Amino acid sequence: MGYLFEETLSSNPKTPIVVDDDNELGLMAVRLANAAAFPMVLKASLELGVFDTLYAEASRTDSFLSPSEIASKLPTTPRNPGAPVLLDRMLRLLASYSMVKCEKVSVGKGERVYRAEPICRFFLKNNIQDIGSLASQVIVNFDSVFLNTWAQLKDVVLEGGDAFGRAHGGMKLFDYMGTDERFSKLFNQTGFTIAVVKKALEVYQGFKGVNVLVDVGGGVGNTLGVVTSKYPNIKGINFDLTCALAQAPSYPGVEHVAGDMFVDVPTGDAMILKRILHDWTDEDCVKILKNCWKSLPENGKVVVIELVTPDEAENGDINANIAFDMDMLMFTQCSGGKERSRAEFEALAAASCFTHCKFVCQAYHCWIIEFCK
């Protein structure tokens, strides 16, 4: 049975807290020192299917579920009789981060019950074709392949080198994926860029009049699938390495073409570079962009979809948090990879012979940037 509440019930008595600067700083310090708990609980909850279970129930009945009810509805039924107690402990942490809503039943055992909050829709495993999902992004970020690279961070600062290579026998990320089918599949399932593209298409008009659109490093082709569904006149060419295309489904109007963007790029009226440039050094980016430039007609353009770092690290700025978090992910995952500022993108455009660089619009954490020939 689900639980419906007309009013919010207070789950905690009001406890007087001495408010002073030292106390507040101490609380912040303790929270930071224990920050590892939240992402690991988030990952386990995603793997268990907790958010999908809660969101499905909230969509149907808008009701709360007890930990026992959640356990019984998970995709894999727990064999552990203590699972509801453990789920309750995990869920109350998630509730403290406003990912789920917690209430306490005033009858019976007085147990806590939970309901999905709206933010959960961004973490649904089965929501990739709707808005995209961050679930796979969380899971891949905390996979052992990437976790092992973080252990190298101190030594890279002191001695130099490449964090990913130090952790994986000198191999770079994309070479490694050719040797690890499990991780490659997991990496290519990261699907939130679909949400970015869909959000951008609400306002971005730059694909109107395009006949042939090449997605350079397009992975499994889902970006072109979204674009061509809105612009069915466009012929899409999804261009990537053979290993990436091996898992690509078919999309109407989209052709999958294998190749290496460092060698050449298929011709098209326009091109997409979606979260590609942040994987590479400036020198490598210029090589990729020059190959794009060669394959474009006069007045052609590359539509770059990337995060743009702020010039200053503003305290409490969510965009700065995201930008610098992701920059450190690039630091540890990709040799020479980094997030870039507006000035750095303008410099890349100039070094690659493009006449100008236009920052058109923002979708979630990414900007749509046009490099115009």
Curated annotation (Swiss-Prot):
Signal sequence segment: none
Induction: By the green peach aphid Myzus persicae.
Residues annotated for S-adenosyl-L-homocysteine binding in this entry: G217, D240, D260, M261, K274
The keyword tRNA processing is annotated on this UniProt entry: no
EC number: 2.1.1.-
Pathway: Secondary metabolite biosynthesis
PROSITE patterns: SAM_OMT_II
Superkingdom of origin: Eukaryota
Enzyme class of the recorded protein, top EC level: transferase
Keywords linked to the UniProt accession: Methyltransferase, S-adenosyl-L-methionine, Transferase
Any one Gene Ontology BP term: callus formation
GO MF term set: methyltransferase activity; O-methyltransferase activity; protein dimerization activity
Record: active site: H278 (proton acceptor)
Family classification: Belongs to the class I-like SAM-binding methyltransferase superfamily. Cation-independent O-methyltransferase family.
Function: Involved in indole glucosinolate biosynthesis. Catalyzes methoxylation reactions of the glucosinolate indole ring. Converts the hydroxy intermediates 4-hydroxy-indol-3-yl-methylglucosinolate (4OH-I3M) and 1-hydroxy-indol-3-yl-methylglucosinolate (1OH-I3M) to 4-methoxy-indol-3-yl-methylglucosinolate (4MO-I3M) and 1-methoxy-indol-3-yl-methylglucosinolate (1MO-I3M), respectively.
Name by which UniProt lists this protein: Indole glucosinolate O-methyltransferase 2
